[in-house]
A protein has these predicted regions:
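Structural preference for solvent-exposed beta-strand-turn elements
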Residues: 2-372
Length: 372
């Protein structure tokens, strides 16, 4: 269903003030993508939205408790007017602008959210994308507490290193840091998102080719992990990357004390233009060698693909460029999720040009405000 725009006016004394335009999005069949991409982009653009049909015909109807916590935090972080956001809701609104049409978000605005019992990675992605919409001279710092790592999770919300590099191209200073680890279902960790707009995103960013490999960063960590497990992980990664490609990765460890027991491995591939992130979360007693080999295989597969980003990082980067009103050219692996994301971005008014290449899809993406 194509997006619908709602408009009205508000009478104040004898003067009629036009309210902001509200985009209506039908979330049926694409609920996760609306949460992951549409709402953070609209928050960055300062565009109000009404979401309808959110899980309205499924066995479990409407917003889940975790989704409610996520949306309320996004609303707080952007000082939005949230209406109808409760467990089981199928229809809700987020007003990201004031009635006079000016942005609500103030300079140096930030949120401290204690989300014990909820994963923070999706929110890290939400607030990072929204931060790309900061105006020149504005800054913010968010601090989120909750599960920093969830088993079977994707790298959604972990792509901070690559997004920070893209942000610099768009005049934004961005830093995402994990300051304490917490694994589902017991621990609570802390992640901060800090952003400062140095200049307007005025130029197009041409990242059609990833360019040269700059580094591979490996982060090993956990809450009270077994030292021998991390030692074996590190040794296997060092050996695999050196024997196959003569690459020496930069390895760091992040260890927290707490009551939960968990370990994780994160590999960030840093290229001249773009990069990729792969994570694996395991129990304290998980065998380290399969974990290491899986991660190295993914990293080397990305390097051989000639893509600008992996799928998850790439779609997030496209969303960020639209939120910042910039223009971005990239090459991504064609996937069903990418196709769905492009369709959603078009519903938000983005202009997207596509060109096929061997094993890749070359894309040029411009937001409505940067087009023309």
């Amino acid at each position: 269903m194509p997006p619908v725009f709602l408009k009205g006016s508000l009478a104040v004394g004898t003067v009629a003030i036009e309210t902001t335009e509200t985009l209506e999005i039908d979330a049926s069949g694409r609920e996760a993508m609306v949460l992951d991409l549409a709402l953070p982009v609209l928050a960055g653009q300062g565009r109000s939205v009404r979401v309808v049909g959110f899980r309205s015909s499924m066995g479990v109807s409407g917003l889940s408790p975790r989704e409610v916590a996520r949306l309320r935090t996004l609303g707080l972080a952007t000082s939005a007017r949230a209406t109808g956001i409760f467990e089981g809701a199928n229809d809700f609104r987020l007003g990201f602008k004031s009635e006079q049409g000016g942005p609500i978000v103030a300079p140096s605005f930030g949120v401290q959210a204690d989300l014990g019992g909820h994963p923070v990675a999706p929110l890290v992605s939400d607030l990072t994308i929204a931060a790309f919409g900061l105006a020149a001279g504005e800054s913010l710092t968010h601090e989120l507490k909750g599960f920093t790592h969830v088993r079977s999770a994707t790298a959604h919300g972990y792509c901070g290193r690559t997004l920070a590099a893209l942000a610099r191209e768009f005049g934004l200073d961005l830093k995402i840091s994990t300051e304490g680890l917490g694994f589902e279902p017991q621990g609570v960790g802390t992640v901060s998102v800090a952003a400062s707009r140095l200049s307007k995103a005025g130029r197009a960013v041409d990242w059609k080719s990833p360019g040269v490999l700059r580094a591979i960063h490996v982060t090993l960590g956990g809450v009270r992990p077994k030292p021998e497990q991390l030692d074996r992980l590190e040794a296997e990664i060092l050996e695999s990357l050196w024997e196959t490609r003569r690459i020496e990765p930069a390895i760091s460890r992040v260890v927290s004390q707490g009551v939960d027991l968990g370990a994780f491995l994160q590999i960030d591939v840093e290229c001249e233009h773009g990069g990729a992130t792969f994570i694996d979360v395991a129990g304290r007693s998980a065998a380290p060698l399969p974990l290491a080999r899986r991660a190295v295989k993914k990293a080397l597969g990305f390097l051989d693909s000639e893509a600008t980003f992996d799928e998850i990082t790439g779609i997030t980067a496209l969303a960020a460029s639209i939120a910042t009103a910039g223009e971005l050219e990239v090459s991504l692996p064609p996937t069903e999720r990418l196709s769905s994301a492009l369709s959603l971005f078009r519903d938000l008014g983005a202009f997207i040009e596509e060109e096929e290449a061997p094993g890749l899809l070359r894309l040029k993406v411009r937001s409505t405000s940067s087009a023309g």
